[in-house]
């Protein structure tokens, strides 16, 4: 990497603002905890001192006064311990920020001193940091039940690389855990707990997440035929949103009647039809003895009400709920919704992408009667080392712009064959000689083979091409 295209420290800071945004939010939350703790204990201590003063006025209540004084001492000790924990937590966060500032200052020094070795070492550690961020966000989680600590491959990677102070993995894995519970286990409980703990932020933003999560809880209760719990959920939680989401609540109330009408009209239908219907719409097993397992396929499929309630019963609601949660979570901590690793990869891809990328020549190859010829041409002739054309990376480049190349790579001696394909004449002749030498073909001295359609032509058939 030359000094002309070497990104400066501001470039990296802009793409890694979350390394400072997350600690900033954690400091703010720590300060809020301190204020709440101080306020609550101040009120409690004032009450205890008032009681103590009352007891001291009566000389016959010395023992009670001593007990109350001990209570005050215990309360102060508890307050001191909790304040000390918050203070230590704040120092830990500040130390992390200092180390991250120093980390990027190192890059600036290495770049200024043109120290290539140290700069490459810094980039390796930085690449590890990007990979760790991606793994923590998307890796599968496991719980150490003994210590009640969540872990995944990303955290293990962070610890082996010594990057604990450069990434707030505790925050990222919290989002990962809630997200995985939604997508894989269809479990709303962790999400609802997070919403309760962050209700002030969600209310301030006017978020729809709380309503959508409670609505999904109601729908799942109806799915399970727990009608009493569903009605209780509707009355306790959803009814408060009547003025904001009247249309959605009307549909939610109608789902209960819809299920019951299907139940009453489908008593005599065959079990196989019921299984298909519930497997398609209600996420039921193929067959379980259940009150709702007697719904009629013909009645429901032809029921116009199904069109109304379909969107609420759609399993894609879990995916949209997950996206909504991640958006709110990342917004809270000012985290980039897009993975930094993929952002950097996209930047590299966009500088390499051309209009020819993604067009696989191997799919156009016509097989030769000799399988060894096919294998050789596929591996040594049409194989490309272009990273953009890699089947794992190309999907990332589909929405990226093409690179602007000011130079073109042209064949030195371009010729066109009678079939319209254009090649470098020397490379085409060299390929034919190699195939003959390895015994794959028996071409004459003046013959060449088109590597794509395997047609054989004489060199006298070449048509000289002149790039314009």
UniProtKB/Swiss-Prot annotation:
Short name of one Pfam family: CTLH
An annotated Gene Ontology molecular function: zinc ion binding
ZnF region ranges: RING-Gid-type: 386-453
Recorded GO CC terms: cytoplasm; GID complex; nucleus
Taxonomy, superkingdom: Eukaryota
GO BP annotation list: negative regulation of gluconeogenesis; proteasome-mediated ubiquitin-dependent protein catabolic process
InterPro entries: CTLH/CRA, CTLH_C, Fyv10_fam, ZF_RING_GID
Domain CTLH, chain residue ranges per copy: 171-229
Keyword Aminoacyl-tRNA synthetase annotated: no
Record has Cytoplasm as a keyword: yes
UniProt KW keywords: Cytoplasm, Metal-binding, Nucleus, Zinc, Zinc-finger
Subcellular location: Cytoplasm; Nucleus
Main subcellular location: cytoplasm
PANTHER family found in the cross-reference section: E3 UBIQUITIN-PROTEIN TRANSFERASE MAEA, MACROPHAGE ERYTHROBLAST ATTACHER-RELATED
Family statement drawn from the similarity comment of this UniProt entry: Belongs to the FYV10 family.
The protein's role, per its UniProt record: Involved in the proteasome-dependent degradation of fructose-1,6-bisphosphatase.
Name of this chain's protein: Protein FYV10
Organism: Kluyveromyces lactis (strain ATCC 8585 / CBS 2359 / DSM 70799 / NBRC 1267 / NRRL Y-1140 / WM37)
Gene of this entry: FYV10
């Amino acid at each position: 990497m030359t000094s002309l295209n070497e990104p400066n420290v501001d470039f990296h800071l802009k793409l890694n603002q979350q390394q400072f945004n997350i600690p900033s939010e954690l400091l703010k939350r720590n300060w809020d905890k301190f204020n709440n703790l101080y306020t609550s204990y101040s009120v409690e201590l004032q009450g205890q001192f008032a009681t103590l003063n009352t007891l001291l006025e009566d000389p016959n209540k010395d023992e009670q006064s001593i007990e109350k004084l001990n209570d005050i001492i215990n309360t102060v000790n508890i307050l001191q311990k909790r304040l000390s924990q918050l203070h230590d937590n704040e120092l830990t966060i500040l130390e992390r920020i200092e180390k991250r500032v120093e980390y990027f200052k190192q890059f600036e020094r290495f770049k200024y001193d043109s120290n290539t070795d140290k700069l490459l070492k810094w980039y390796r550690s930085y690449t590890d940091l990007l990979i760790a961020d991606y793994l923590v966000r998307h890796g599968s989680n496991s719980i150490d039940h003994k210590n009640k600590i969540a872990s995944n491959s990303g955290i293990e990677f962070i610890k082996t690389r010594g990057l604990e102070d450069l990434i707030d993995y505790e925050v990222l894995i919290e989002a990962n855990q809630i997200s995985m519970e939604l997508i894989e286990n269809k479990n709303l409980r962790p999400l609802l707990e997070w919403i309760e703990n962050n209700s002030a932020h969600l209310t301030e933003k006017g978020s729809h997440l709380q309503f959508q999560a409670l609505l999904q809880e109601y729908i799942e209760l109806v799915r399970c035929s727990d009608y009493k719990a569903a009605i209780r959920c509707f009355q306790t939680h959803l009814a408060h949103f009547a003025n904001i989401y009247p249309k959605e609540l009307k549909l939610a109330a109608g789902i209960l009647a819809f299920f019951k009408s299907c139940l009453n009209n489908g008593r005599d239908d065959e079990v196989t039809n019921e299984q298909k219907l519930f497997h398609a719409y209600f996420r039921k097993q193929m067959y379980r003895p259940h009150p709702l397992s007697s719904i009629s396929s013909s009645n429901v499929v032809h029921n116009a009400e199904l069109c109304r309630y379909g969107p609420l019963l759609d399993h894609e609601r879990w995916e949209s709920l997950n996206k909504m949660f991640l958006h709110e979570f990342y917004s809270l901590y000012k985290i980039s919704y897009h993975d930094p690793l993929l952002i950097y990869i996209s930047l590299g891809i966009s500088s390499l992408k051309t209009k020819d990328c993604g067009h696989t020549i191997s799919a156009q190859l016509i097989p030769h009667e000799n399988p060894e010829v096919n294998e050789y041409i596929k591996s040594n002739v049409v194989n490309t080392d272009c990273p953009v054309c890699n089947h794992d990376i190309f999907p990332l480049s589909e929405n990226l712009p093409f690179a602007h190349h000011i130079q073109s790579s042209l064949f030195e001696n371009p010729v066109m064959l009678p079939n319209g394909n254009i090649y470098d004449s020397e490379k085409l002749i060299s390929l034919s000689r190699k195939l003959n030498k390895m015994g794959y073909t028996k071409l004459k001295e003046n013959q060449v083979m088109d590597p794509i359609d395997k047609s054989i032509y004489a060199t006298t058939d070449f048509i000289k091409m002149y790039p314009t």
